[in-house]
Amino acid sequence: MTAPGSAAPSPGAADPAPHPGAPLTIALGPPEHGVTRFAVDSARAAGTPVLEVREVAALPAALAGRGRGPVHLHITDPLFGRTPDEAAAAVEALAADRPVSVTLHDVPQLAEGAERCRRRTRAYQCIARAAGLVVVSSEHERRLCADAGIAVDAVIPLPVPALGPPADLSPDARSVGVFGFLHPGKAVDVVAEAVAALAAGGDADITLRLLGAPADGHDDYVDAALQTARAAGGRVEVTGRVDDEDLARVLGEVTVPVALFRNVSASGSLGTWAAAGRRPLVWDSDYIREMEHDRPGSLLITDGTDLAGDLRRLLGDPSPTRIPPPPPGIEELGRAYRAAWAQWPTGPGGLA
């Protein structure tokens, strides 16, 4: 086991042969974090060498002896510092020694709160100024960046992963499933309240299944949501992190998949639901409309005015929640990153 804060080779399959001129991708953070995992996956898809580092404090030592070649960072500010300003300073320090390109994740938006948005926007502006190339994962994120005065060089959508069909699938009788790290942005409390309303109305078999683990600092929030459903007579389950080999089965078992987002700029979990052949119930938003345009028929969009009623109808007939899985998009992801780096004037191809 690799000690926290140390660099380590990518787990699992070996990295592909490096693509000529590709920057070193730094996958910063715990391996189970979604952004860290995506950094590794996108690097492998693009044929980019990967350096995995658990903590930002370990970056200087991990890069020692590697020269001053270009690097690519996948950034969400909590991975790079205890505060947004600390995160920006860490990227600026790195960019002082070598060319840096970045993919900005979790782009700030007002829905997360005005003061938090202000602090994070200032940090993302500093990061973008330090970077020679800025990538985001949706047109919605591009618009958010434009509103903040951040120029985006490329939009590379999050791909549908390759899950494959489950070996054994036993669909639940009456369950509502929420997938991924559990926190207020996933509106777990709202889903729990809708499940509680159905249970209180006589649905004795309904189960709230939370297919993931609480995000750091949100155990009490998840516990409160579970208690809401349980107090009304509903059944509850928290699986903890779902192993990759079990994803297709676990996501395929739930009766009604739900992916409500209070504030989202791009979401990998929607692609994972699709890869499992599921069409989740989602709140309408700019990003959701963008995803429905890109993958027509992949989402069940609701205005949220009667979530309990939406769930009741789908529990009675869950067939609209099942779709043929779209083809995986990992190869296209790799091509898109290579194309973006090729246009980087101070990056690969432009370095002495």
Say what each PLM segment does.
Residues 37, 305, 309, 315-352:
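A charged, aromatic-enriched C-terminal amphipathic alpha-helix characteristic of glycosyltransferases
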Residues 89-93, 98, 116-133:
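Membrane-proximal helix-turn-helix segments that form the acceptor-binding/catalytic region
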Residues 168-186, 192-195, 208-209:
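Conserved donor-binding/catalytic core segment of Leloir-type glycosyltransferases
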Residues 129-165:
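Donor nucleotide-sugar binding/catalytic pocket of nucleotide-sugar-dependent glycosyltransferases
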Residues 222-242, 248:
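Nucleotide-activated donor-binding/catalytic signature segment of Leloir-type glycosyltransferases, i.e.
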Residues 249-265, 278:
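Acidic donor-binding loop of glycosyltransferase active sites
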Residues 279-284:
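Short hydrophobic beta-strand element within catalytic cores of glycosyltransferases
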Residues 207-223:
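Glycosyltransferase donor-sugar binding loop
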